[in-house]
């Protein structure tokens, strides 16, 4: 029976009862999942994402709200704007998860109604794209995305079982007219290809699920075998990967370490052509080169013998502001905050704090804060001018950070650079 199997999945994967945010579309799958959860004592909320792609979306939102009132479950309606540049399906999925991430609470898991037929479709779509074992692993019953835990308790349940349950419980649901549009790859597989395959091989979906499970096992084993080395070279918090030893590794091992690093950083996986570019342009080029590669909303960069992932960076090079004693200023583009005290400047960014100790002669005078400087500059209490490029290199500041590094000036003289790397001190 579907209910008992559902309860078993819930207990197996979450022995301590979780709080659940259910992704509710109003279709038969999510309505059945809502009904199943309602028959447990699980604390439950539901969210409907209004993509604005159908003229019926308002009616579907009203249906979901009424359904949640019937079940006495808190309901969230969230409208989103879909970026169609990467395709409607991908854009809708990205917008949906982004909206859910904004609403889900720290103690909640996300429950979705993906089932066995969806798993088969996902596997075949990955096969069409030429995916490796990670892509062919398809969906997992429990997975993680954007710091969310996602639970798919119906993943081993067939569409027919869901339909039978809905009929037995006399449930009501809506039909999305776009599901019949075979222009979309998933619908083409669902409506035309899989019915033929199931007619020939009735257990085809179960066999696909088995293959996906084998791929998952291979991917997990690979990650386990390389985890120690990845830990040695990668800094996940800073999204950096040290590659000085990669010349001793085979191209396959190089690629797998980069794949695992990107996955841990929750970055979209590059295409095969992009991986070839990473191996040739990032790992095998001269250390004085500064290649970069766009990966969706991130940019892969290299400085010296380290790879870095950076988000889209705003232009901050023209920032210039006076910093007086006992004053606090906010830096642009989330670069942090500076607080001036008589003896020091305190730099705070996220959970990091750094201090620049000021010499006696500068403790009462106004100082100027800049984020960029080129050419030669006179150092405070130094006899000669120096090239900023040399100072940046000495401080090991990557090229793209040189328009985002705090420079403390007294009049036209550079007092020091203030970074997150180390405490700094200037003495008379």
Curated annotation (Swiss-Prot):
Catalytic reaction(s) noted: cytidine(34) in tRNA(Ile2) + L-lysine + ATP = lysidine(34) in tRNA(Ile2) + AMP + diphosphate + H(+)
UniProt-listed Enzyme Commission number(s): 6.3.4.19
Similarity-based family: Belongs to the tRNA(Ile)-lysidine synthase family.
Function: Ligates lysine onto the cytidine present at position 34 of the AUA codon-specific tRNA(Ile) that contains the anticodon CAU, in an ATP-dependent manner. Cytidine is converted to lysidine, thus changing the amino acid specificity of the tRNA from methionine to isoleucine.
Superkingdom: Bacteria
Amino-acid positions noted as binding ATP in the UniProt annotation, renumbered to this chain: 25-30
Broadest EC class assigned to this enzyme: ligase
GO MF: ATP binding; tRNA(Ile)-lysidine synthase activity
Protein's UniProt name: tRNA(Ile)-lysidine synthase
Domain topic, free-text comment: The N-terminal region contains the highly conserved SGGXDS motif, predicted to be a P-loop motif involved in ATP binding.
UniProt KW keywords: ATP-binding, Cytoplasm, Ligase, Nucleotide-binding, tRNA processing
Disulfide bond entries: none
Pfam families: ATP_bind_3 (PF01171), TilS (PF09179), TilS_C (PF11734)
Main localization category: cytoplasm
A cellular component term, taken from the record's GO annotations: cytoplasm
PANTHER family: TRNA(ILE)-LYSIDINE SYNTHASE-RELATED (PTHR43033:SF1)
Example GO BP: tRNA modification
Localization: Cytoplasm
């Amino acid at each position: 029976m579907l209910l008992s199997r559902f309860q078993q999945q819930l207990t197996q994967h979450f022995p301590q009862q979780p709080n659940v945010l259910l992704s509710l579309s109003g279709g038969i799958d999510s309505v059945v999942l809502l009904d199943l959860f309602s028959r447990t004592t699980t604390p439950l909320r539901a969210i409907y994402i209004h993509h604005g792609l159908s003229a019926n979306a308002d009616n579907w939102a009203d249906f979901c709200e009424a359904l949640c009132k019937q079940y006495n479950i808190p309901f969230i309606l969230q409208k989103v704007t879909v970026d169609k540049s990467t395709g409607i399906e991908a854009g809708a999925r990205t917008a949906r998860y982004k909206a859910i991430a904004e609403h889900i609470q720290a103690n909640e898991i996300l429950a979705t109604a993906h089932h066995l037929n969806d798993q088969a479709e996902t596997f075949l779509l990955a096969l069409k794209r030429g995916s490796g074992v990670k892509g062919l692993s398809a969906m997992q019953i429990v997975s993680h995305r954007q710091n969310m835990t996602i639970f798919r308790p119906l993943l081993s349940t067939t569409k027919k079982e869901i339909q039978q349950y809905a009929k037995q419980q006399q449930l009501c649901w809506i039909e999305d007219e776009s599901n019949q549009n075979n222009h979309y790859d998933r619908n083409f597989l669902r409506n035309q290809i899989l019915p033929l395959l199931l007619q020939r091989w009735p257990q085809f979906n179960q066999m696909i699920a088995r293959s996906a499970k084998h791929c998952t096992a291979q991917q997990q084993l690979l990650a386990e075998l390389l985890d120690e080395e990845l830990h040695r070279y990668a800094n996940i918090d800073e999204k950096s990967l040290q590659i000085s030893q990669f010349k001793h590794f085979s191209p396959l091992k190089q690629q797998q370490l980069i794949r695992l690093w990107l996955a841990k950083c929750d970055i979209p996986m590059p295409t095969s052509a992009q991986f070839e570019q990473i191996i040739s342009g990032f790992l095998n080029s001269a250390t004085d080169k500064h290649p970069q590669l766009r990966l969706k909303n991130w940019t892969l960069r290299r400085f010296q013998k380290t790879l870095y992932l950076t988000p889209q960076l705003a232009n901050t090079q023209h920032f210039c502001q006076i910093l007086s004693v006992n004053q606090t200023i906010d830096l642009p583009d989330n670069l942090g905050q500076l607080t001036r005290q008589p003896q020091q400047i305190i730099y705070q960014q996220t959970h990091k704090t750094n201090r620049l100790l000021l010499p006696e002669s500068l403790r009462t005078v106004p100082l100027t804060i800049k984020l960029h400087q080129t050419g030669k500059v006179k150092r405070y209490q130094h006899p000669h001018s120096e090239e900023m490029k040399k100072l940046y290199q000495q401080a090991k500041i990557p090229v793209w950070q040189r328009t985002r590094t705090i420079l403390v000036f007294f009049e036209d003289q550079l007092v020091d650079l203030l970074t997150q790397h180390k405490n700094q001190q200037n003495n008379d």
